[in-house]
Amino acid sequence: MTVADLWFDPSCPYTWVTARWLMEVRKVRPVEVRWHVMSLSVLNEGRDDDPEGDPEGYLWIPARICAAVQRDHGQQALERFYTALWTTGTGDWIGDLRTALSAAGLPVELAEAGLGTGYDDVVRASHAEGIALIGGDHVGTPIVAVTREDGERVVFFGPVVSRAPTGEQAARLWDGTLLVAGTPGFHELKGRPHEEPHTT
């Protein structure tokens, strides 16, 4: 079976749309999705500007909770929590963290992990693993590393999509992305300017 490792910042709406696309892909292609946290807060450390507009460091909180969920409860729990973050709120951004933990069948006390630095090393290590695969910090979230059954690995940033395709459209985007990203020498492809993400 093909494995798609997804590195995601849980607060990024475009990444959530990409995650929904991968959930669709696994319905129509033999793909296992594995979840890994990364952090835009880590990515943007030391920059003069703050492209995320997060001077208070709020974006650390959901990333830390994801790291705690992954370390203490595993992959399936992380997928459930990440999904609940985006499906228990208003739909345009992540919902209440405790509500999402409860909806995912996880202890709501895990929300406390977001308020301290105890999981920062876990976040940083997972983030560094994804960034190392893509070869530097010239990209953001998400990073996808696809390992095919023959062992060949294709790594790419994105795709950044505003709407999650379903069914055969999801499969076509998957097949095309692997074809393009797996071409020796391929670096970048961009489409039209971004639309607001359709997160529901």
Residue spans for each PLM region:
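C-terminal cap of thioredoxin/glutaredoxin-like
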Residues: W21-M23, W93-T200
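Extreme N-terminal starter segment of soluble prokaryotic enzymes
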Residues: M1-D5
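Residues at structural and domain junctions
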Residues: F8, P51-E52, G116, R163
